[in-house]
Amino acid sequence: PMQDVGVNNPSTTVLIPCRNEKGNIENAVKRLPNFCDDLEIIYVEGNSQDGTLDEIHRVIKAYPDKDIKVLVQDGKGKGDAVRKGFDNARGDILMILDADLTVPPEDLPKFYRAIVTGKGEYINGTRLVYPMDDQAMRFLNFWANRTFSVLFSWLLNQRFTDTLCGTKVLTKKNYEKIVSNRSYFGDFDPFGDFDLIFGATKLNLKVVEVPIRYAAREYGETQISRFRHGWLLLKMVLFAYKKLKIV
């Protein structure tokens, strides 16, 4: 069990980075199970154009019994949102839930159990195990993700089947260690996920993957520009290769 937290039912912060996700804000709260006694929800809002911020304020008022906070991004991108949210989180355990809800909030208790029972210290969701909604991960996306997972598994000497799944879970203590090591990899991480993966493997944390059902988004448009992100990912691979394999 969790020696570095030292409690059986540790508090948790669920971080929800969101930009133009007005239609998903309330569902995230409604569908999130109460899997621990002390659950904090932090929305980090990315200067949306569709009234997402107003909707978050409405939801905070509508659910007074839940501990929901909102922060507005100064910078841009998911990486910036994750850093801002986690820096302000009070939970012993930190989780990321993407606001598009393609990873069902109902699956988060599995991540909680995996970290609390000591199965792993860095829990990564994987969307490649369960069958997916037809629309959820298009063919090109699926193969790109497969390819990058193989590359990153080789680079990091850890098996990752899905490096791009948005749901990651780790303890606040380990997150703080990753932050103090961050200069090693620099701030080049437009996705906000890879500095956590790099940092976790550099600290030799025990990485465990939790399979999740991956659903098509119900509201809004995907904010992934495939080719731009593919190019950025390729740069990340080369960058990591220089850092990790050329010693």
Question: Can you describe what each PLM-predicted range is?
Answer:
Residues 1-11, 27, 34, 181-247:
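Hydrophobic helical membrane-anchoring modules
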Residues 12-21, 28, 35, 44:
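A conserved hydrophobic helix/loop-capping motif in glycosyltransferases and polysaccharide synthases
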Residues 21-24, 48, 78, 104:
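Donor nucleotide-sugar binding loop of glycosyltransferases
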Residues 23-27, 50-59:
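Acidic helix N-cap motif at the loop->helix transition within catalytic regions
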Residues 38-48, 71-72:
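Short beta-strand/loop segment that forms part of the nucleotide-sugar
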Residues 45-54, 101:
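A conserved acidic beta->alpha catalytic loop
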Residues 67, 73-88, 105-186, 190, ...:
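Acceptor/aglycone-binding surface of glycosyltransferases and processive sugar-polymer synthases
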Residues 94:
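Short aromatic/hydrophobic "clamp" motif used to bind/position activated sugar donors
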